[in-house]
């Protein structure tokens, strides 16, 4: 039973990340928290531009982010997010949305940075049901 080492979640308005991060840090003070954003969001210092990953990403930094204790930001391309949407559907039979695909891609990056066997948790906030007309399962 190892303690939780990392939390990885997308941020749109920031509410999900902030609420869960604070609760988990109370229980696990050494917890590393990583925000997931699509390429085109500005949290990592890049310029804002359009992206296809729905539900996460910001065009301005919300004021409460200044006081938030997080380890880093993982920027995930639309291509990687949608790759994992398709991978999860094909291999696990789950219909996740693009922000969930981005969360998985970022979680895999973070897992490589953690010690072997460390525990990590993420959030899959969306399903792909509302995006089926956008042909997200086509390669």
Over which residues does each language-model region extend?
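Active-site/ligand-binding loops adjacent to catalytic centers
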Residues: 25-98, 135-139
